[in-house]
Amino acid sequence: PDNATLLKIYALYKQATTGDNADKKPGFGDMVGRAKWDAWNNCKGTSSDDAMQQYIDLIESLA
């Protein structure tokens, strides 16, 4: 999968297991950390169950 899809998988996993992102945004020099933080932060407000279902649907679509 491409990077955007991998970030979405990461974000949905974090949202399903941890909930809304409350972590401090990584510094400008940490491009990977910032991309992951932004992806997770875009899921803010999504319930754990919804995030789990979206994660499953996305993984199944890759098969």
Question: At which residue positions do the language-model features occur?
Answer:
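A charge-rich, low-complexity, intrinsically flexible signal that marks solvent-exposed coils, linkers
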Residues: P1-A63
